[in-house]
Amino acid sequence: MEQEQDTPWIQSTEHTNIQKRESGQQTQRLEHPSLTRLMDPYPRTMNRADTHKQIVSWRQWLSLKNPTQGSLKTRVSKRWKLFSKQEWTN
């Protein structure tokens, strides 16, 4: 079997394949999550926490691969907004 790079879409596909194997359905290896969603006859519902984790891991991976001034500004401004919201609610 070939060595694969440790990339987010392969990780998420691997996770999907493991879930399908456990439920006894036929597995199909796909390289990208959007293809998995299109081809899967029983789409999984993701809760908000799972979706957020997936988005965060993608952003971290992308920023590690190609950090730009814009991505740093976005990260800082989002953290500031979250912090200021917490201040208002407390």
From Swiss-Prot:
Which stretches does the entry tag as region Disordered?
1-45
Answer yes or no on keyword RNA-binding.
Answer: no
Per UniProt, subcellular location reads as: Host mitochondrion inner membrane; Host nucleus; Host cytoplasm, Host cytosol
Q: Which UniProt keywords apply?
A: Apoptosis, Host cytoplasm, Host membrane, Host mitochondrion, Host mitochondrion inner membrane, Host nucleus, Host-virus interaction, Inhibition of host innate immune response by virus, Inhibition of host MAVS by virus, Inhibition of host RLR pathway by virus, Membrane, Modulation of host cell apoptosis by virus, Viral immunoevasion
Function recorded in the entry? Plays an important role in promoting lung pathology in both primary viral infection and secondary bacterial infection. Promotes alteration of mitochondrial morphology, dissipation of mitochondrial membrane potential, and cell death. Alternatively, inhibits the production of interferon in the infected cell at the level of host mitochondrial antiviral signaling MAVS. Its level of expression differs greatly depending on which cell type is infected, in a manner that is independent of the levels of expression of other viral proteins. Monocytic cells are more affected than epithelial cells.
Q: What is this protein called?
A: Protein PB1-F2
Compositional bias ranges of the Polar residues kind: 1-16
Bias class Basic and acidic residues marks the residues at: 17-34
Origin organism is Influenza A virus (strain A/Duck/Hokkaido/8/1980 H3N8)
Q: Which gene encodes it?
A: PB1
User: Which InterPro entries does the annotation name?
Assistant: Flu_proapoptotic_PB1-F2
